[in-house]
Regions:
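Catalytic or ion-translocation cores adjacent to nucleophile or general acid/base/metal-coordination motifs
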Residues: 280, 289-312, 318-372, 376-379
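Helical scaffold of the NTase/Pol beta-like nucleotidyltransferase catalytic core
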Residues: 238-240, 270-297
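Active-site microenvironments that recognize anionic phosphate/pyrophosphate groups
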Residues: 1-54, 59, 68-267, 271-274, ...
Length: 481
C-alpha cells in the first residue's frame, strides 16, 4: 500500500541523512500531499490507534497521561507506532523497490501522463526532491567540511548526497557492462552504457510535438537545479550544485548523473558561453586542481568532431580516478628553450600527447600557451595536417590537469578535425568501418582511455557469441556483419 511505501521512503531518508529527525513530520506531510492523501495512516490503523491510545490514557495519572500524550504525539509522525525509525529495518538498499511501488500506484491512479520510463523518471525525481535539503544547506555543509576537515571530506559528502538522492541512479549504473582490455599502451577501460534508459515511441513523439522551451538553455546550465523537467528535458528537483570560484570567475561543481568512473564530476561556467581552449582554460584547470588536489580535471576540445557532445556551454570534467593515459609513461623527453625548469615529454599513447610537469603552474601554463599557439597554426601537408581550410580552423587541444605528489602535470592532446569526402566525420576519427561499434565524438573521456560504448552492443555481442558457439557462418548473416 502507498502509505507503507511513504513510511519506508521517509525511513530511507532518515537512514541516509537526507532527512533529519526534525524534518520527519514535514517530509511525511509533503509526500502524502503529493499522493493526494489526507493521512499517512490507512483507515483501520487510525481507528485502532485511537482506541488503544484512549484506553491507555484513561488508566494513568495526570503525569502519566502527559507522558503518554508526548509518546503518542511522537508516534503520530508517521501514523503508526515505530514504523518510521532510523533504527528500524534497513532501507538504504531498497530505494529502487520503494520508488517502483510509488510509481506503480501513481500510474494506477492516473497521476502519470503515460506509464513509461520518461514519465516515471519525471515523477520519481519529484518524489525524491521532497526529501532534499535546500541548496544553501548543502553548500554550507560542503564548505564547512572543506574548511574544517578536508576537500576530500567535502566531495565525499556531496558524492554520497548525489547518490542517496537518486540524482545518480546507482541501481541503473550497476547494470553497465565494464571490463578492462590490456594493450601495449596500458589497461584500457571499456563500458557498455546501460544507465541511460531508452525512450519509448510515445515519449519520443510527445517530445517532438512539445513546445520548444529555452529554459534551461542546456543540460549544464545552473537553472537546472530544482527544475521539474518535461518530456524532452530531465527533471532535476533532486539536484544540488556547489558554487566554486576558479581563476576569479563563478563556476558550478556537480557530479555526472551517469558516473562513467569514480566521482565523475562536471565543472561548468555559471554563464551559458561556448567552449574555448585558451590561456584562461589552463589557469582554471590548475586553480580547480589546487582547490581539489585529489581530483584530475580536463576540458573537451572546442571544435566539432574532436570535442564533446556539448560545445555550447563551457565546462570541464574531472573526478577521483586515474585513467590509463595518466599512468602511461613519457617515452621521449625534451626541453623547450626558455622553459628549462619545466619537464616536457611525449607520452606513450595512441594519440599525440605532450606532458608538461613542474612545481610552478605559471611556468607550465606559459609553455602550454606557446604549444597551443604553435599548434593552432601548424600545417604539415605530407602528414595531411592543415591548420585551416577555407577559413575553417582544424587544430585544437584537449588539456588535462592533475597533481602528482609535489608536482603539477598538464597533458596536452593534439587534435585535428579535418574531414574529406571519404571520411566526412573526420580523418582523425574512427572511420566508417568502425561505426557499427561507435560513431560519436571521441571526447575527453575516450581520449584518457575509457571507451563508452552504446547500449545496443550488449545484445549484438550476445548474438555474436551465440553465433560463434553455434558454428554459424558470420559473413552469411546480415545482422552480424
Amino acid at each position: 500500500m502507498i502509505q507503507n511505501a511513504i513510511r519506508r521512503l521517509v525511513r530511507y531518508g532518515l537512514q541516509t541523512g537526507l532527512v533529519e529527525k526534525e524534518d520527519e513530520i514535514y517530509t511525511t506531510n509533503r509526500l502524502i500531499e503529493l499522493f493526494g492523501l489526507d493521512s499517512p495512516e490507512v483507515q483501520g490503523e487510525q481507528a485502532d490507534g485511537a482506541a488503544e491510545n484512549g484506553a491507555e490514557a484513561s488508566g494513568k495519572q495526570a503525569d502519566g497521561a502527559a507522558q503518554n500524550g508526548a509518546e503518542t504525539s511522537g508516534k503520530q509522525i508517521d501514523g503508526a507506532a515505530e514504523e518510521v525509525s532510523v533504527d528500524a529495518a534497513d532501507e538504504t538498499g531498497n530505494l529502487e523497490g520503494i520508488l517502483k511501488e510509488m510509481l506503480d500506484y501513481a500510474a494506477e491512479k492516473g497521476m502519470l501522463a503515460a506509464d513509461s520510463v520518461v514519465y516515471r523518471d519525471l515523477f520519481d525525481t519529484k518524489i525524491m526532491g521532497l526529501l532534499m535539503p535546500r541548496p544553501s544547506e548543502v553548500i554550507r555543509k560542503f564548505y564547512d567540511l572543506y574548511k574544517e576537515v578536508s576537500p576530500e571530506a567535502a566531495t565525499g559528502y556531496y558524492y554520497d548526497l548525489s547518490r542517496n538522492s537518486d540524482y545518480i541512479r546507482r541501481y541503473r549504473i550497476a547494470r553497465d557492462k565494464k571490463w578492462v582490455a590490456p594493450t601495449e599502451y596500458g589497461d584500457l577501460d571499456i563500458t557498455i552504457n546501460l544507465s541511460k534508459p531508452e525512450k519509448d515511441p510515445k515519449a519520443i513523439a510527445a517530445a517532438k510535438n512539445a513546445p520548444q522551451s529555452g529554459y534551461p538553455k542546456c543540460l549544464l546550465c545552473k537553472e537546472n537545479e530544482g527544475y521539474a523537467g518535461r518530456v524532452n528535458h530531465p527533471a532535476r528537483q533532486n539536484h544540488r550544485i556547489i558554487p566554486v570560484t576558479i581563476n576569479g570567475s563563478r563556476w558550478g561543481f556537480q557530479y555526472s548523473p551517469y558516473v562513467y568512473y569514480n566521482e565523475h564530476c562536471i565543472v561548468f561556467n555559471s554563464e551559458h558561453v561556448p567552449m574555448k581552449i585558451e590561456h584562461a582554460t589552463f589557469c582554471k584547470l590548475f586553480d580547480f586542481v589546487k582547490q581539489f588536489p585529489h581530483y584530475f580535471v580536463g576540458s573537451n576540445a572546442d571544435l566539432p568532431i574532436v570535442g564533446g557532445s556539448i560545445l555550447s556551454h563551457d565546462h570541464f570534467q574531472g573526478g577521483h580516478y586515474e585513467f590509463a593515459m595518466a599512468k602511461a609513461p613519457v617515452e621521449e623527453t625534451f626541453r623547450a628553450a626558455g622553459f628549462e625548469d619545466v619537464e616536457a615529454g611525449i607520452v606513450k599513447w595512441p594519440m599525440s600527447v605532450i606532458r608538461l610537469s613542474g612545481t610552478d603552474t605559471d611556468r607550465i601554463i606559459a609553455l602550454a600557451d606557446k604549444i597551443l599557439a604553435n599548434w593552432r597554426g601548424y600545417t604539415d601537408e605530407e602528414a595531411f595536417i592543415y591548420a585551416e581550410t577555407d577559413g575553417e580552423p582544424h587544430n585544437t587541444i584537449t588539456p588535462i590537469a592533475r597533481k602528482r605528489r609535489d608536482k603539477y602535470e598538464l597533458d596536452l592532446v593534439l587534435r585535428n578535425n579535418i574531414t574529406t569526402a571519404e571520411h566526412p566525420l573526420g580523418v582523425y576519427h574512427p572511420h566508417a568501418k568502425l561505426h557499427h561499434i561507435k560513431k560519436e565524438n571521441i571526447g575527453l573521456i575516450e581520449v584518457m582511455g575509457l571507451a563508452v560504448l552504446p547500449a545496443r552492443l550488449k545484445q549484438e555481442l550476445a548474438d555474436l557469441k551465440d553465433a560463434i558457439l553455434a558454428g554459424k557462418d558470420l559473413r552469411a548473416s546480415e545482422e552480424l556483419c
